[in-house]
């Protein structure tokens, strides 16, 4: 098992090269954070760090480490919801070692997602279940003044993109990032 990425990150390295053809989600996440111009933000993320193995860096994303670095510097809060205690333990470990605060919610995100956040990152299950969950989660926060990110469009956002089009809600597609692209929805302008 290869844990070299986690070890490098914990060692303070920031420019860590990964051998993969997958375009990491990081630029899209940073693009969204940049929209807040260094202001404190509250973030709700569905899904913690699956594994500290390097191969999970591009499939699982590790987005809470990017969000965490932002709130460490500019303030705000990060809540991560996951049904898997091991995933939350990984997220907790990284936050403790990298020095940012995190709120952990064990259970289905639909039970804890609320309208109190500036950014929502809906990154739950893949496949039919994930597609349905993503749509349900979005409907629960649809009337917020927030930015919503969803990755793995082909497995998590098929129903959501149809819903957005039917409601004439604009969204931006980032095809070359993550596994199958990402979308961002800026609900602050609606």
Residue ranges and their predicted role:
Residues 48-51, 85-87, 125-127, 154-155, ...:
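Short, solvent-exposed loop/turn segments at secondary-structure junctions
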Residues 1-40:
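Class I SAM-dependent methyltransferase Rossmann-like catalytic core
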Residues 149-190:
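A short, conserved beta-to-alpha structural element at the edge of catalytic cores
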Residues 105-161:
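Active-site segment flanking the S-adenosylmethionine/decSAM binding pocket
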Residues 51-54, 87-90, 112-113, 129-130, ...:
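Short catalytic/ligand-binding loop motif for oxyanion handling, primarily in non-cytosolic enzymes
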Residues 11-19, 51-56, 122:
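Surface-exposed cleft-lining segments at the edges of enzyme active sites
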Residues 20-28, 59, 63, 86, ...:
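Soluble or luminal CAZymes and related metallo-dependent hydrolases
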Residues 27-109:
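SAM cofactor-binding core of SAM-dependent methyltransferases
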